């Protein structure tokens, strides 16, 4: 299932909603083979099966879902910030170094910093340079970073 972001982080997959003769509906993922359901269906809608962080599952019509959500592998910088505010790590496909990501630090009573800040973690940096620094330091976005649509959630 692909991950998407809107006002909240959800998981979703393309699916059909079948209306059965008894008035009930059944949601079937596009890649599922359910000929017995298709044979009993009186109508079919195209859309998404959506799973929320608390496990709740629902159905969303295709147009409504695609207007509200964007896959987390092609986010704007603004959506990347929202993802960090929800506790996710983010990175850019356009960065030269692989294995690096950003996190948002929210200070607590033990922190020396008093306001939230973004930092970059380079501990997993994959590079041919044996002298490349590895660690975690505060980070500032460039104009290119802020205007890029290649941000993604790091799993």
Residues of each region from the PLM?
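Motif-centric detector for short Cys/His coordination patterns
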Residues: 1-97, 106-115, 141, 153-155
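Acidic, glycine/polar-enriched metal-coordinating patches/loops
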Residues: 113-147
């Amino acid at each position: 299932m692909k991950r998407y972001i809107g006002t909240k982080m959800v998981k979703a997959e393309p699916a059909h909603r079948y209306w059965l003769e008894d008035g009930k509906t059944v949601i079937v993922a596009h890649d599922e083979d359910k000929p017995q359901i298709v044979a009993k269906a009186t109508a079919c809608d195209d859309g998404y099966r959506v799973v929320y962080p608390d496990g709740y599952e629902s159905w969303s019509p295709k147009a409504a879902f695609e207007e509200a959500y964007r896959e987390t592998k092609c986010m704007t910088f603004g959506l990347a910030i929202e993802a960090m505010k929800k506790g996710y790590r983010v990175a850019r496909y356009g960065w030269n170094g692989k294995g690096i990501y950003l996190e948002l630090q929210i200070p607590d009573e033990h922190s020396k910093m008093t306001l939230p800040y973004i930092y970059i973690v380079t501990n997993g940096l994959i590079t041919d340079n044996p002298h490349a620094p590895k660690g975690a330091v505060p980070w500032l976005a460039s104009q290119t970073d802020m205007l890029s649509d290649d941000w993604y959630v790091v799993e």
